[in-house]
Amino acid sequence: MKRKLSLVLIILLSFAFSSCEDQEARIAKKADKIHKAILTVDTHCDTPMRLMRSDFNLGVRNEDGCVDFPRMEEGGLDAEFFAVFIGQGPRNPEAYNEVYERTVETLEKIYDNVEKNSDMAELAFTVDDAYRIKKSGKRIAFIGIENGYPVGKDLSKVKEYYDMGARYITLSHSSNNDICDSSTDEGGAEHDGLSEFGQQVVKEMNRLGMMVDVSHISDEAFYDVIETSTSPVIASHSSCRALCESPRNLDDDMLMVLKDNGGVIQICILSNYLKQPELNPVLEQKLNEIREKYNDFEGLSEEEFERARREYYEVRNKYRKLATVEDAVDHIDHVVQLIGIDHVGIGSDFDGGGGIEGVMDVSQMKNITHELLRRGYTRNEIEKIWGGNIMRVLRENEKLAQETSEEAGT
């Protein structure tokens, strides 16, 4: 009798395992079909820092880094916003000139890399560009600027960067600048939000049709931006403070205000912004050793900074327990339940710390879609999350800029 029961149990378990495998195969097949049909967009990667190396080519499948065109194709990712990241430094004329030159050089590196891989990718400057390039089968390269520091105190720089292809500026980074306060400046607030010059920057971005990015900025600066901007704004790589306490994330009130503005939060798949990190003394010791080795990352050359950043993230990824795809989709769920499906997207922060269990680079992006399908999201909802919402915001910025230009007779 026991033998018969054991046999029945084995048969039932085999059917259960087979059913699960069949279900996962169906999900994978459906995800492939969806990704071929819709426009998929990641609004933030820091890969341009790697382009400063002469040997880094977006057109080949690299062993290091998280983003290149072959892996974008593998992961079903059509479009990437390549962020020109400039760390905060001194605020004086000499530094502003140096930062301007670095920004232009990085922009040129993006152009050069896309041009030499023109059979695989093309730069996009408008929503229509993105959908046209999608139809051609090529990858799409948008440009953003992370940190308003390269603007310095010169408002004309905003248009100059727009003319060079940048379609958003993250107003600050880890420290305060002349535009606004950062959410993570150790010295606290300097402007109590957005400075008077920052208000001019936001208005100029509105005039041009350039998206204002509120990731990294302080809560007070966020509310000031919302009050100042006449166009929908974005949080290019932030998550939900209700699920993970971090000044880099948006709380529920901010999300409600973002909805009223018509904007979108692009959920950041950087582990510490999705799930509170567990205390790990070994990890902290290793990271402190790297901070000490590299003078707390201050006064470094570009090569030294890149080496320090690489060592830092290698150690962090080795010794910490990463958040999962499920954790990331929990944040998407939270936004959808609180303010609706029209205000959420994905901003990986790849090559800047982004990467979670199951999605360590762009080749694994479909795993997010798999989890969305498991939770019952429809094709149309997935289309909005993966690109429809951010393209709506960009188009609205384009439209309002055009209307402003026509009213001004220019």
What are these language model-derived features?
Residues 8-16:
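Bacterial N-terminal signal peptides
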